Amino acid sequence: MRGNSRPSFHWVAALLLFNSSLVAREQLNVLFIISDDLTLTALGCYGNKVCKTPNIDRLATEGTLFTRAYCQATFCGPSRASLMFGYYPYATKANGYTSGREKVGPDKDSWPQYLRNNGYHSARVSKVFHMGVPPDIAKGSDGADDPASWDEKLNSRGPETWAPGKGETLQNNPDGTKKLAGGNRFVVVEAEGGDLVHSDGKTAQKAAELIHRYKTLDKPFFLAVGFVRPHVPFVAP
């Protein structure tokens, strides 16, 4: 027992020092960006020589590149719930496409909620907690969001599988004879319209507008921005 108690004390002491230093120094604005189903093997900063990802590569060069950051679960819902609440999936009991709030309970804060309760304006654009892709994006609905986390929320409705344009089902369709399939399938759609017709284009525009608007806030802001690609279906202009 002795071996476990001393590191625990040091950890608690470190947390206390960290919290006191937060109070002492200026509260900084926080921009949190998350994409959907983006594997590190598709990024130049992790060694991919084919995909062109200059903006992410620059962030990696100027910041911290994590090499041992792991998903907490094998799919979206539990991973997002774990990330946003800081609990392992076995604690959130979010085994499906939920926010995790149902099992965590109203007395536990997500970290956006913690910032909100400590003087921050907390906002999100599009998918941060779970949203169904394509259904919630096509409808512009909240999905399995956590309302207690935000002062402000914006959804980015956009065309999905049935967008006007040329589409093809690639999943289990080697000869190209299958019709365009809906749902969570490996589908490519060359959709009509430019970036601002699509969910991610709208999300980027809204996020930029909020950052400019928040210059006049009398408090710091936390802005969470969620992009739904490269989650299937691959719908792009």
Name what the model sees in each region.
Residues 23-237:
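Formylglycine-dependent sulfatase
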Residues 1-11:
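Bacterial N-terminal signal peptides that target proteins for export
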Residues 10-20:
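Bacterial N-terminal signal peptides
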